[in-house]
Curated annotation (Swiss-Prot):
This is Hainantoxin-III 5. The modification Leucine amide is found at L81. One of its GO terms (cellular component) is host cell presynaptic membrane. Negative results: has no activity on Nav1.4, Nav1.5, Nav1.8 and Nav1.9 sodium and calcium currents. It is found in: Secreted. Keywords: Amidation, Disulfide bond, Ion channel impairing toxin, Knottin, Neurotoxin, Presynaptic neurotoxin, Secreted, Signal, Toxin, Voltage-gated sodium channel impairing toxin. Residues 1-21 form the signal peptide. InterPro entries: Huwentoxin-1, Huwentoxin_CS1. Monomer. Expressed by the venom gland.
Length: 83
């Protein structure tokens, strides 16, 4: 559900960028705008304090995010369904 919302929002943003760039009179503007949007050189991701689905973990430690548990068999965070 969240993924479909994200994809819809990303599609709308991309549509807006393309529409705005096509209306621009400068020929270099679309290329500059897209290069700034998709530039990953300056992007430094924030590290989370917990591990998400599929991340490796150590059983017995509380490393996984809420609603996830460290699988003692596979040694990665999985969805905790409770018992």
């Amino acid at each position: 559900m969240k993924a479909s919302r994200f994809l819809a929002l990303a599609g709308l943003v991309l549509l807006f960028v393309v529409g705005y760039a096509s209306e621009s009179e400068e020929k270099e503007f679309p290329r500059e705008l897209l290069s700034k949007i998709f530039a990953v050189d300056d992007f430094k991701g924030e590290e989370r304090g917990c591990k998400g689905f599929g991340d490796s973990c150590t059983p017995g430690k509380n490393e996984c995010c809420p609603n996830y548990a460290c699988s003692s068999k596979h040694k990665w965070c999985k969805v905790y369904l409770g018992k």
